[in-house]
């Protein structure tokens, strides 16, 4: 299957988006998160540290093959991955930096080193208060000329959680990763919810061998953390959009790890949309389409949620006609919650946003507008 190549304007927006973990692009609290984690692990292990950054456009091979993803795996699908060309992608994980970095350190094999790889990653994801299409991740790989096993892995988990969230309750669930053995998902309790902050496991021996680090001498631990989620927990933020806010009252609080003080509580405006879309469309794909259509104005959307999906054959004929549903389509009831972080939107502004979302997603032949666009049709 031919991949869907990213449009030039979407590519430009992606590669010029500020990486909040990079001090060269200005200070941000996410940098403090990286510093605190790195310092805690270095103190625990007394190991060397190597921080590494790389351009977000990577060969497909680095993002998947070298990490032992199966050739026909679903993760490679253009529904989840943003292709720059047939052979390059915007990295979906900071783990894409690891195989090449392992080859570099194999030239002068370490006794004990922690690889620290922060940066932006790019997903096609849903829109809500916890998700963004461009989250920040941190890969941490400890490589040592000694056996590293489950005890060291759990020590790593405890050190990271205690460094940022002292006393927090956390749990680990078994999960499979192609580049680890005995993988785990890490969740932290936040009130009545469990929030995933990352995944980890023992480094896959084959990856070390392929990099020139024989497993007869070397072993490794691998961990990937969601930095945005961690910062939200530390500062008790309720909305991920605050991390990129340009309002001085919000941005000024994104420079440290102190608790966040809400600027204001804007009222939520809800709009429900009845859409005809291809039967293969996913919630993540719909969210990504909205981001591409609205650009920076997506910051005014708190969430975009699929409420119901109905196959064409189960939709009443009059309803099919009303939305112009055709063959190979399904009816999606979508709820958008419009709430700007710093100002109250007018009903007219909310309707215009609703219509732009509708225009980006609806694939039927009949249209139902809410704002002035409908008056001009």
Annotate each predicted stretch with a short phrase:
Residues 30-44, 152-165, 285-294:
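Amphipathic alpha-helical segments
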Residues 21-26, 138-150, 271-279, 346:
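Short histidine-centered catalytic/ligand-binding loop motif
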Residues 178-190, 194-377:
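A carboxyl-terminal module marker
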Residues 140-141, 145-146, 162, 230-232, ...:
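Long, well-ordered mid-to-C-terminal structural blocks that present hydrophobic/aromatic surfaces
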Residues 1-131, 142-143, 194, 199-208, ...:
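Class II aminoacyl-tRNA synthetase-like tRNA-binding/catalytic domains
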Residues 41-48, 109, 161-169, 293-304, ...:
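Short secondary-structure junctions
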Residues 150-155, 159-184:
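Extended C-terminal subregions enriched in glycine
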Residues 47-62, 170-177, 302-306:
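Long, charged, glycine-rich C-terminal linkers/tails
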């Amino acid at each position: 299957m031919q991949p869907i190549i990213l449009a030039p304007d979407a590519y430009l927006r992606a590669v010029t988006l500020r990486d909040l973990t990079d001090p060269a692009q200005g200070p941000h609290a996410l940098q403090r998160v990286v510093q605190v984690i790195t310092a805690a692990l270095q103190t625990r292990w007394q190991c060397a540290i190597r921080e590494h950054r790389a351009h977000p456009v990577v060969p497909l091979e680095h993002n998947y093959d070298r990490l032992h993803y199966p050739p026909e795996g679903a993760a490679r699908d253009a529904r989840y991955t943003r292709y720059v060309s047939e052979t390059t992608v915007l990295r979906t994980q900071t783990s894409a930096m690891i195989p090449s970095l392992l080859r570099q350190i194999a030239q002068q094999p370490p006794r004990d080193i922690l690889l620290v790889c922060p940066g932006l990653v790019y997903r096609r994801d849903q829109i809500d208060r916890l998700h963004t299409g461009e989250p920040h991740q941190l890969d941490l790989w400890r490589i040592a000329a000694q056996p590293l096993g489950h005890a060291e892995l759990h020590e790593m988990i405890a050190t990271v959680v205690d460094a940022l969230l002292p006393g927090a309750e956390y749990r680990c669930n078994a999960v499979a990763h192609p580049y680890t053995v005995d993988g785990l998902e890490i969740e932290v309790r936040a009130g009545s919810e469990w929030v995933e902050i990352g995944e980890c496991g023992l480094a896959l021996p084959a990856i070390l061998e392929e990099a020139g680090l024989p497993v007869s001498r070397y072993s490794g631990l691998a961990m990937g953390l969601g930095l945005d989620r961690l910062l939200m927990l530390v500062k008790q933020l309720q909305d991920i959009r605050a991390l990129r806010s340009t309002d001085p009252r919000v941005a000024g609080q994104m420079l440290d790890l102190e608790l966040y003080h809400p600027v204001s509580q804007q009222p939520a405006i809800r709009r429900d949309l009845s859409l005809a879309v291809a039967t293969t469309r996913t919630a993540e794909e719909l969210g990504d389409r909205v981001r591409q259509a609205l650009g920076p104005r997506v910051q005014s959307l708190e969430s975009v949620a699929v409420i119901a999906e109905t196959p064409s054959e189960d939709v009443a004929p009059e309803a099919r006609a009303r939305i112009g549903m055709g063959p190979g389509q399904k009816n999606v009831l979508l709820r958008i919650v419009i709430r700007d972080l710093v100002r109250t939107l007018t009903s007219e502004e909310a309707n215009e946003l609703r219509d732009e979302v509708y225009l980006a997603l609806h694939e039927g032949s009949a249209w139902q507008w809410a704002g002035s666009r409908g008056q001009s049709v």
